[in-house]
């Protein structure tokens, strides 16, 4: 019996160790980083993050420059940050490698010194959290602050990976649905699939069986995006509101145009 107890304790400890390991796949192999390894790097330092998106306050973290963990990744690559809960943030590598003044850092939660919970009954943002210094210079949106990160992968552009999401190829580059597809990639596909394609697991598909533009009036659709709690409310709701600082009126118009366009291009998964 004592041996069994010791083995269970050992396996439990091993499980905790695995939980605090970050897998980084640059396309040339996977590198697993433990919390201890990251905090021991010579480029790790304490950083101050004003206006932390997740904690809504100024926070200080021990962190590593994100681009230092992406050796050899070109600026035109695409990065996917997947969290433990299925949230999948899609971020152009150029924003991290050359953020034009915005600086990405991987904040690391030290063992035995947990960060505050994100809310009542919720875990912290750790063990790995992408934070930004001067995000407005990117610009960097709130969906590009993924927390509880489990994996980082270099992947092809979403338009190549998910062809059923693409608008009609006959449309010009400046057509509203084409611009709206870019908005969808920045703000929506972190939580939603479309036509059954995408990696997110949090929100409903935005075209199958119906696009929200098919069952909501235009003003109600805008309420859903700007202030979702004003349209429907339940305890497990996770959708944030997107104000004009994050999503301009033109971007919202383009997103609506894209979803209306895709309502006529349904592909059953």
What are these regions (language model features)?
Residues 158-183:
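Electrostatic cytochrome c docking/interface patches
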Residues 193-226:
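Gly/Gly-Pro-rich "capping" loops immediately C-terminal to redox-active cysteine motifs
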Residues 180-195, 221, 239, 255-259:
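The canonical Cys-X-X-Cys-His
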Residues 20-156, 269:
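Structured, non-membrane catalytic/scaffold regions adjacent to prosthetic-group chemistry
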Residues 117-167, 213, 218-220, 242-260:
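Periplasmic c-type cytochrome electron-transfer domains
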Residues 91, 201-207, 227-256, 262, ...:
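Axial heme c-ligation environment in periplasmic c-type cytochrome domains
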Residues 15-19:
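Sec/Tat signal peptide C-region and signal peptidase I cleavage site
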Residues 5-13:
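Bacterial N-terminal signal peptides
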């Amino acid at each position: 019996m004592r041996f069994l107890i010791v083995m269970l304790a050992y396996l439990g400890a091993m499980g905790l160790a695995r939980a605090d390991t970050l897998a980084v796949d640059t396309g040339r192999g996977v590198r697993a980083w433990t919390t201890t390894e990251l905090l021991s790097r010579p480029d790790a330092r304490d950083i101050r993050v004003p206006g932390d998106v997740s904690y809504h306050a100024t926070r200080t973290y021990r962190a590593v420059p994100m681009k230092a963990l992406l050796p050899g990744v070109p600026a035109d690559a695409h990065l996917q940050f997947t969290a433990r809960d299925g949230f999948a943030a899609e971020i152009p590598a150029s924003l991290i490698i050359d953020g034009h003044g915005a600086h990405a850092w991987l904040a690391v939660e030290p063992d035995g010194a947990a960060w505050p919970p994100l809310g009542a009954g919720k875990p912290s943002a750790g063990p790995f959290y992408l934070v930004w210094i001067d995000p407005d210079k990117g610009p960097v949106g709130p969906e590009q602050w993924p927390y509880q990160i489990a994996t980082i992968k270099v992947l092809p552009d979403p338009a190549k990976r998910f062809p059923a999401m693409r608008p009609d190829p006959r449309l010009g580059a400046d057509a509203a649905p084409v611009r709206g597809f870019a908005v969808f990639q920045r703000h929506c596909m972190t939580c939603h699939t479309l036509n059954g394609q995408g990696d997110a697991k949090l929100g409903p598909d935005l075209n199958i069986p119906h696009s929200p533009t098919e069952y909501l009036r235009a003003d109600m659709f805008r309420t859903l995006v700007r202030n979702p709690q004003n349209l429907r409310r339940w305890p497990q709701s996770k959708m944030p509101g997107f104000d004009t600082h994050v999503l301009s009126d033109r971007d919202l118009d383009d997103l609506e145009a894209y979803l209306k366009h895709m309502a006529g291009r349904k592909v059953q998964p």
